[in-house]
UniProtKB/Swiss-Prot annotation:
Keyword DNA repair applies: no
Protein family membership: Belongs to the TtcA family.
Record protein name field: tRNA-cytidine(32) 2-sulfurtransferase
NCBIfam families: PRK10696.1
Extra remark beyond the main annotation: The thiolation reaction likely consists of two steps: a first activation step by ATP to form an adenylated intermediate of the target base of tRNA, and a second nucleophilic substitution step of the sulfur (S) atom supplied by the hydrosulfide attached to the Fe-S cluster.
Protein's gene: ttcA
Alphabetical GO biological process terms: tRNA thio-modification
One Pfam family hit: ATP_bind_3
E.C. numbers: 2.8.1.-
Organism: Hyphomonas neptunium (strain ATCC 15444)
Length: 295
């Protein structure tokens, strides 16, 4: 794993707190992201360093929320330390929401010397027109946004779209799929699109949302609230997060244990013949007993 000792000269961090707690927080987020990058092969650092492959380009999605700001800051930090040999392009999709402060992100990105692209597409009108009253906008909004970002990634020559989803997003998605979808699935750290030409990366997928909130406050990011999906009542994701909050209150550390479970899967102890050959289990073969399963 590459060295992630912190340098004080990255412009984005020039005026950040000098407290030990902030330094630990920053280091925790940076090292966590680097571990995800290395574990799931988001970049072939060795091949790039030896010249076998050119520097890839990543399209880093910036919504103006705390998570995407944190994502960009962490990636820039890794890039600055020489641990991420990737060209980064920050991208904001202006979806035409009424009252959206168009000046904030371009000014902040320019001030911090970040290469960026602002895309304007009025998906707001489409979503509010097509989605029936009382239904949530999330699904259609996400599909439209994803299609636009794939297109921009291709136009910019980017091999990957990078998103700021974190551990708590993954757990809420897992619970939604479990309870409402009848399947075991969360958010993958690395995904290939249907056309096979653009990847989706989530380097913060092991980061705690609380850490990102503290980081955003310390960094004084100019947060832009979502006035579409984020303002609707009755979102199932909100319900799942409340459920997880309650479990965390009753048993601190529950979220981290659940996140660990996503990396510790035993297909032989589930019921899906597509991922485990139950029919092929024969006497005399290698067994897989589990003392934690009631007999």
């Amino acid at each position: 794993m590459a060295d992630t000792s912190l340098s004080p000269v990255l412009p984005l961090f020039a005026n950040t707190p000098s407290s030990v707690s902030f330094k630990k927080l920053r280091k925790r987020l940076v090292r966590g992201a680097l571990e995800v990058i290395d574990t799931y092969g988001l970049v072939d650092r060795r091949a790039i360093e030896t010249g076998e492959k050119p520097h890839p380009k990543w399209l880093v999605c910036l919504s103006g929320g705390k998570d995407s700001y944190g994502l960009l800051a962490v990636l820039l930090d890794l890039q600055w330390q020489g641990a991420l040999p990737v060209d980064l392009i920050a991208c904001n999709l202006d979806q035409g929401q009424p009252g959206f402060p168009k000046h904030i992100l371009p000014e902040w990105l320019t001030q911090n010397g970040v290469t960026h692209k602002i895309i304007t597409e009025d998906t707001y009108s489409i979503v509010t027109d097509k989605v029936p009253e009382g239904r949530t906008y999330c699904s259609m909004c996400s599909r439209l946004r994803r299609g636009i970002l794939y297109r921009v990634a291709r136009e910019e020559g980017c091999e990957a779209i990078v998103l700021g989803h974190h551990r708590d997003d993954a757990l809420a998605t897992f619970m939604m799929n479990l309870i409402h979808g009848g399947r075991l699935a969360a958010m993958p750290p690395k995904l290939l699109n249907d056309d096979g030409d653009v990847q989706v990366f989530r380097p913060l997928i092991t980061a705690a949302e609380d850490d990102l909130a503290k980081f955003a406050e310390a960094m004084e990011f100019p947060i832009i609230p979502c006035n579409l999906c984020g303002s609707q009542d009755g979102l199932q994701r909100v319900v799942m997060n409340r459920m997880l909050d309650e479990w965390e209150r009753k048993k601190p550390g529950t979220r981290q244990v659940m996140a660990k479970a996503l990396t510790n899967v035993r297909p032989s102890h589930l019921h899906d013949p597509r991922v485990f050959d139950f029919a092929g289990l024969m006497l005399g073969g290698k067994g897989e007993d589990d003392p934690n399963v009631p007999f």
